[in-house]
């Protein structure tokens, strides 16, 4: 130091609490430490904190104004077949903790109600296709296709899968054997697992937003409302198991949709690598949502296609074609037919 003496440095190592409970002071108030300040939380913020810590589980809350009349019996009948039971609808819902006191729980409504969005407006999936690589608004709005899906989660997942599959492109290139080979824009497992994870693990207590799938020319983005749950981080999500909505996750697993979160994420990486595409990118914009971005490498694929075309036609022939003739030849070459 300035006196020429050694400084004494104290290092305080405070381990994170293993308790998942929210501590209240004598008057019932709850404070949250943010940087160097203690901030008093509102009732809504306290509930959100309790959900995040797992002290309360939003999917187990009751969906007000719900009843057996809201049930989609086709979906519930499928579930009863999976369980191999002949019990009544109400018995099944009660025994699996999807109904209490004649009302559906949030999980019960999301999984089995005809229209969960009537009780939970945030419960929907929206799929959008954009022309280009950026989202534009106003007079430059570039949405070419848009559809929202409401209904019980098993139906939403199936219907969204069908639409997205129909909107994805295929790429063709000339293989080393001289034959055309077709590859999908993205490996199916990667985008579908991303969709299922978003629907399953999103924060349904987070109101005002919904699961969103945005398709651009060069990438596909899947946004799930709410930050990552509890102990999961961007860095450890490939190895950490945790479910914010365990009842929903278990039931969708019984329907054949859901894997363990870390197992599915790890395979998304593997599938993208096997398709010679960039690794998936996970991010938490504003710490209020989780975004998965899959890049389709369209530029490199276009270059490879052009190079393959040039291998089949001389530069003189290509240069002699008009702009429209060249576009027609490229289209026929890409599709493998005229």
Stretches with model-predicted labels:
Residues 12, 110, 292:
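A residue-level signal for conserved active-site and pocket-lining positions in enzyme catalytic cores
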Residues 329, 335-338:
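Short acidic, hydrophobic short linear motifs in intrinsically disordered regions
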């Amino acid at each position: 130091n300035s006196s020429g003496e050694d400084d004494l440095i104290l290092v305080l190592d405070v381990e994170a609490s293993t308790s998942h409970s929210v501590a209240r002071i004598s008057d019932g108030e709850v404070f949250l430490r943010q940087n160097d300040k203690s901030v008093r939380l509102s009732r809504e913020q306290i509930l959100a904190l309790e959900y995040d810590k797992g002290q309360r589980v939003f999917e187990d809350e009751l969906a007000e104004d719900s009843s057996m009349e809201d049930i989609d019996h086709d979906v519930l009948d499928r579930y009863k077949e999976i369980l191999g039971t002949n019990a009544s609808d109400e018995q099944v819902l009660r025994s699996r903790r999807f109904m209490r006191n004649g009302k559906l729980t949030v999980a019960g409504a999301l999984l089995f109600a005809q229209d969960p969005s009537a009780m939970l407006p945030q419960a929907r999936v929206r799929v959008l296709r954009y022309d280009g690589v950026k989202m534009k608004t106003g007079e430059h709005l570039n949405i070419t296709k848009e559809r929202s899906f409401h209904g019980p989660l098993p139906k939403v997942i199936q219907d969204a899968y069908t639409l997205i599959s129909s909107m994805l492109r295929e790429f063709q290139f000339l293989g080393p054997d001289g034959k055309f080979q077709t590859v999908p824009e993205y490996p199916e497992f990667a985008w579908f697992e991303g969709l299922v994870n978003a629907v399953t693990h999103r924060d349904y207590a987070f109101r005002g937003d919904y699961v969103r799938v945005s398709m651009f020319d060069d990438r596909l983005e899947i946004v799930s409302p709410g930050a990552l749950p509890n102990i999961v981080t961007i860095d450890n999500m490939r190895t950490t198991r945790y479910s914010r909505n365990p009842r929903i996750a278990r039931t969708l697993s019984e329907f054949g949709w859901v894997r363990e979160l870390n197992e599915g994420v790890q395979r998304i990486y593997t599938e993208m690598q096997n398709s010679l595409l960039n690794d998936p990118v996970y991010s938490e914009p504003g710490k209020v949502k989780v975004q998965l971005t899959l890049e389709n490498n369209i530029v490199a694929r276009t270059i490879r296609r052009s190079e393959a075309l040039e291998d089949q036609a001389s530069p003189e022939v290509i240069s002699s074609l008009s702009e429209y003739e060249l576009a027609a030849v490229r289209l026929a070459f890409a599709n493998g037919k005229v």
